Amino acid sequence: MRRAGLGEGVPPGNYGNYGYANSGYSACEEENERLTESLRSKVTAIKSLSIEIGHEVKTQNKLLAEMDSQFDSTTGFLGKTMGKLKILSRGSQTKLLCYMMLFSLFVFFIIYWIIKLR
Protein backbone atom coordinates (compact mmCIF):
# COMPACT_ATOMS: atom_id res chain seq x y z
CA MET A 1 0.00 0.00 0.00
CA ARG A 2 1.48 3.32 -1.04
CA ARG A 3 0.90 6.49 0.85
CA ALA A 4 1.33 9.85 -0.80
CA GLY A 5 4.34 11.85 0.28
CA LEU A 6 5.93 9.33 2.60
CA GLY A 7 9.59 9.32 1.74
CA GLU A 8 9.20 9.95 -1.97
CA GLY A 9 11.85 12.09 -3.60
CA VAL A 10 14.05 12.34 -0.51
CA PRO A 11 17.68 11.53 -1.21
CA PRO A 12 19.35 9.31 1.37
CA GLY A 13 20.86 11.31 4.21
CA ASN A 14 19.16 14.57 3.14
CA TYR A 15 16.50 15.31 5.71
CA GLY A 16 16.13 19.05 5.07
CA ASN A 17 12.44 19.92 4.91
CA TYR A 18 11.45 16.29 4.50
CA GLY A 19 12.23 15.08 8.05
CA TYR A 20 8.54 14.59 8.78
CA ALA A 21 8.19 12.33 5.75
CA ASN A 22 10.99 10.03 6.90
CA SER A 23 9.57 9.82 10.39
CA GLY A 24 6.15 8.92 8.95
CA TYR A 25 7.75 6.30 6.75
CA SER A 26 9.67 4.78 9.65
CA ALA A 27 6.50 4.77 11.77
CA CYS A 28 4.75 2.79 9.04
CA GLU A 29 7.70 0.43 8.84
CA GLU A 30 7.69 -0.05 12.61
CA GLU A 31 3.96 -0.73 12.56
CA ASN A 32 4.39 -3.21 9.72
CA GLU A 33 7.20 -4.96 11.62
CA ARG A 34 5.08 -5.13 14.76
CA LEU A 35 2.10 -6.54 12.83
CA THR A 36 4.37 -9.00 11.00
CA GLU A 37 5.81 -10.22 14.30
CA SER A 38 2.32 -10.58 15.75
CA LEU A 39 1.22 -12.56 12.70
CA ARG A 40 4.35 -14.73 12.91
CA SER A 41 3.63 -15.60 16.55
CA LYS A 42 0.01 -16.45 15.72
CA VAL A 43 1.08 -18.69 12.83
CA THR A 44 3.59 -20.44 15.11
CA ALA A 45 0.88 -21.03 17.71
CA ILE A 46 -1.50 -22.44 15.10
CA LYS A 47 1.26 -24.66 13.71
CA SER A 48 2.08 -26.13 17.12
CA LEU A 49 -1.62 -26.64 17.82
CA SER A 50 -2.10 -28.49 14.53
CA ILE A 51 0.91 -30.71 15.30
CA GLU A 52 -0.57 -31.54 18.71
CA ILE A 53 -3.91 -32.34 17.08
CA GLY A 54 -2.12 -34.66 14.64
CA HIS A 55 -0.44 -36.53 17.50
CA GLU A 56 -3.77 -36.83 19.33
CA VAL A 57 -5.47 -38.18 16.19
CA LYS A 58 -2.76 -40.83 15.77
CA THR A 59 -3.13 -41.86 19.41
CA GLN A 60 -6.92 -42.07 19.13
CA ASN A 61 -6.70 -44.11 15.91
CA LYS A 62 -4.36 -46.57 17.64
CA LEU A 63 -6.78 -46.85 20.57
CA LEU A 64 -9.71 -47.42 18.20
CA ALA A 65 -7.82 -50.17 16.39
CA GLU A 66 -7.12 -51.92 19.69
CA MET A 67 -10.77 -51.62 20.73
CA ASP A 68 -11.86 -53.01 17.36
CA SER A 69 -9.71 -56.11 17.81
CA GLN A 70 -11.01 -56.58 21.36
CA PHE A 71 -14.61 -56.26 20.20
CA ASP A 72 -13.96 -58.81 17.46
CA SER A 73 -12.60 -61.32 19.95
CA THR A 74 -15.52 -60.67 22.34
CA THR A 75 -18.00 -61.09 19.50
CA GLY A 76 -16.44 -64.44 18.63
CA PHE A 77 -16.55 -65.56 22.25
CA LEU A 78 -20.19 -64.54 22.66
CA GLY A 79 -21.09 -66.19 19.36
CA LYS A 80 -19.59 -69.48 20.51
CA THR A 81 -21.41 -69.23 23.84
CA MET A 82 -24.74 -68.54 22.16
CA GLY A 83 -24.15 -71.47 19.82
CA LYS A 84 -23.56 -73.76 22.79
CA LEU A 85 -26.69 -72.43 24.50
CA LYS A 86 -28.74 -73.11 21.36
CA ILE A 87 -27.41 -76.65 21.18
CA LEU A 88 -28.15 -77.10 24.85
CA SER A 89 -31.69 -75.74 24.49
CA ARG A 90 -32.44 -77.94 21.46
CA GLY A 91 -31.55 -81.07 23.33
CA SER A 92 -33.59 -82.80 25.97
CA GLN A 93 -31.52 -81.16 28.66
CA THR A 94 -33.97 -78.37 29.45
CA LYS A 95 -33.77 -79.20 33.14
CA LEU A 96 -30.00 -78.65 33.03
CA LEU A 97 -30.51 -75.35 31.22
CA CYS A 98 -33.01 -74.25 33.85
CA TYR A 99 -30.56 -75.10 36.64
CA MET A 100 -27.78 -73.24 34.84
CA MET A 101 -29.94 -70.13 34.46
CA LEU A 102 -31.01 -70.25 38.11
CA PHE A 103 -27.40 -70.67 39.20
CA SER A 104 -26.37 -67.69 37.05
CA LEU A 105 -29.11 -65.53 38.55
CA PHE A 106 -28.07 -66.63 42.04
CA VAL A 107 -24.42 -65.72 41.39
CA PHE A 108 -25.38 -62.32 39.97
CA PHE A 109 -27.64 -61.70 42.98
CA ILE A 110 -24.81 -62.55 45.40
CA ILE A 111 -22.39 -60.27 43.53
CA TYR A 112 -24.98 -57.47 43.55
CA TRP A 113 -25.58 -57.98 47.27
CA ILE A 114 -21.83 -57.87 48.05
CA ILE A 115 -21.35 -54.69 46.02
CA LYS A 116 -24.40 -53.09 47.61
CA LEU A 117 -23.06 -53.75 51.15
CA ARG A 118 -19.77 -51.98 50.49
Curated annotation (Swiss-Prot):
Its main location: endoplasmic reticulum. The modification Phosphoserine is found at residue 50. Residues 26-88 form the t-SNARE coiled-coil homology domain. It is a single-pass type IV membrane protein. Residues 116-118 are vesicular. CDD domains: SNARE_Bet1 (cd15853). It is found in: Endoplasmic reticulum membrane; Golgi apparatus, cis-Golgi network membrane; Golgi apparatus membrane. GO terms for molecular function: SNAP receptor activity. GO terms for biological process: endoplasmic reticulum to Golgi vesicle-mediated transport; protein transport; vesicle fusion with Golgi apparatus. The keyword Plastid does not apply. InterPro entries: BET1_SNARE, T_SNARE_dom. Signal peptide: none annotated. SMART domains: t_SNARE. Expressed in muscle. Residues 1-94 are cytoplasmic. It comes from the Eukaryota. It is linked to Muscular dystrophy, congenital, with rapid progression: An autosomal recessive congenital disease that manifests with severely progressive muscular dystrophy, and results in death in infancy or early childhood. Clinical features include hypotonia and poor feeding, delayed motor development, progressive weakness and lethargy, and respiratory insufficiency. Some patients may have refractory epilepsy and cataracts. Interacts with SNARE complex members GOSR2, SEC22B and STX5. Interacts with LMAN1/ERGIC53. Interacts with STX17. Required for vesicular transport from the ER to the Golgi complex. Functions as a SNARE involved in the docking process of ER-derived vesicles with the cis-Golgi membrane. Belongs to the BET1 family. This is BET1 homolog. It comes from Homo sapiens (Human). The lineage of its organism: Eukaryota, Metazoa, Chordata, Craniata, Vertebrata. The gene is BET1.
